[in-house]
């Protein structure tokens, strides 16, 4: 018994000695590098959860896992042409502005449509815009904005359009291998550390290219080298899966797109969701709420009919979406309840909800 006690005492003394040694090291580190250079994770902002920016779709917020795009992180959104990449970023800018935040758009492609941005809810009078001439200029502007600490969201459109100065100065036929990859690698090394301190979210839109000579596996790859893949905390792949038609088959009013979380450092990856994007309107909030409400049994689907309890919303998906567009009070109530279920762990069984004009008080 005494031997066991001696072992415990020795272990405690060893623990105390190691803690004293770490404390002395911490004092020296703070003396050399400044206060807060070494702290316990529980005392730092890192250990207090991840702040996020809503994507504008409750389905995408759930797929990402933290209620939206994580702040202080690098995000890459990539996919084929006309798949909805820019729409996702403009919708995020709209959400930032709704909550009183500040957003910036670095338009390296020189192709931002202010009319479309305004239609998606972006306040173009308050949106900071830069149309740089070179890739170096674009990334330095992004760095300045991050260091300012005043910007909540920066969108870079796109990585493929970040042309290095040497490429612009050279001849059209010059072979300059790896210039853009080296540019991206250096820029990302510089901004990663300051991003977490400023809580700025930076989103890079990227394009797909085909690898030459690939016989097996996926021949697609993104531009700008591998650095962005490594530094990104979140990578979203966006692909168009079908067209959304109106009153006739020839009346195309939008696209249905699939968003896959290819990489996620803040929640489990590889989740897939489908979004409806209407031309000139953006992501259909009501369609996302309808799908999420069916998933969590706030809305019932029997055959082609959609209902809440005994009260019918409409026959067919489009009719139910139109009903939710008209009944904004109900739609807002559904979204609030869904966020409590998804992000706060509230049981769907504890919720009673119904259309405003027919809702019955629970006895």
Curated annotation (Swiss-Prot):
GO BP field: DNA recombination; DNA repair; SOS response
ATP-binding among keywords: yes
Pfam family, one: RecA
Residues that, per the record, bind ATP: 79-86
Keywords: ATP-binding, Cytoplasm, DNA damage, DNA recombination, DNA repair, DNA-binding, Nucleotide-binding, SOS response
Cellular component terms (Gene Ontology): cytosol
GO function term, MF aspect, one: single-stranded DNA binding
Similarity comment: Belongs to the RecA family.
Protein name as annotated: Protein RecA
Function description: Can catalyze the hydrolysis of ATP in the presence of single-stranded DNA, the ATP-dependent uptake of single-stranded DNA by duplex DNA, and the ATP-dependent hybridization of homologous single-stranded DNAs. It interacts with LexA causing its activation and leading to its autocatalytic cleavage.
CDD domains assigned: RecA
Localization (cell): Cytoplasm
NCBIfam families the record matches: tigrfam_recA (TIGR02012)
